[in-house]
């Protein structure tokens, strides 16, 4: 009887494994894999241009990174649509202007991007660094980014970018 049970269990396990093998999704075509790489590369460029445009105080370029109904959420501040996002950033940085453009900058790391057709999500971390009066670099903020993207008119754009701090920064400072 033990031998019979052992055979039944063994057959059941291997049958289950074999059934699981057959339920795996078919491998993606070379074209689909290439499209995924190109999509992730384009989304990565949007994420990097976020920092580049902020650091250059290029508010028009910054706003163009967002979809027509894109949303930017940074703490208690938020705006929807490129014009409102541009206005928000201009207001924040006029109140909290950097000493000189080019003396502060963003760095991004630990990104993951998941693409699903014409939509995507991404998680990343970033740091905002400034030079003090002594020219030494100081960390102003460390941030978690939670992003949603949409392909709009053939280009990837932020559908929503939400910032969540991982380390304190001085009150009222823009990122």
Locations of regions flagged by a protein language model:
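Short, low-complexity N-terminal intrinsically disordered segments enriched in polar/charged residues
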Residues: 21-52, 56, 60, 64
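Short beta-strand edge/turn micro-motifs at domain boundaries
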Residues: 21-22, 119-123, 142-172
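Positively charged n-region of N-terminal signal peptides that target proteins for export
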Residues: 1-4
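Short, surface-exposed coil-to-beta transition loops
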Residues: 106-108, 140-145
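Transmembrane beta-barrel outer-membrane domains
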Residues: 41, 103-104, 138-140
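Short, cysteine-centered beta-strand-loop-beta hairpins and adjacent loop/turn segments enriched
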Residues: 129-139
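A solvent-exposed, acidic/Ser-Thr-rich amphipathic alpha-helical stretch
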Residues: 59-127
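Bacterial N-terminal signal peptides
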Residues: 6-16
């Amino acid at each position: 009887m033990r031998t019979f049970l052992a055979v039944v269990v063994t057959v059941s396990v291997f049958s289950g494994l074999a059934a699981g093998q057959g339920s795996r999704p078919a491998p993606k075509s070379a074209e689909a894999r290439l499209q995924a790489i190109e999509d992730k590369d384009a989304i990565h460029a949007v994420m990097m241009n976020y920092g580049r445009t902020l650091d250059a105080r290029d508010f028009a370029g910054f706003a163009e990174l967002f979809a027509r109904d894109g949303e930017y959420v940074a703490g208690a501040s938020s705006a929807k649509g490129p014009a409102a996002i541009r206005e928000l950033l201009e207001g924040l940085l006029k109140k909290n202007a950097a000493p000189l453009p080019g003396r502060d900058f963003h760095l991004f790391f630990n990104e993951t991007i998941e693409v699903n057709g014409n939509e995507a999500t991404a998680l990343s971390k970033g740091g905002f660094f400034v030079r003090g009066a002594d020219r030494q670099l100081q960390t102003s903020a460390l941030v978690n980014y939670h992003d949603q993207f949409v392909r709009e008119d053939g280009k990837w754009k932020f559908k929503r970018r939400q910032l969540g701090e991982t380390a304190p920064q001085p009150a009222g400072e823009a990122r």
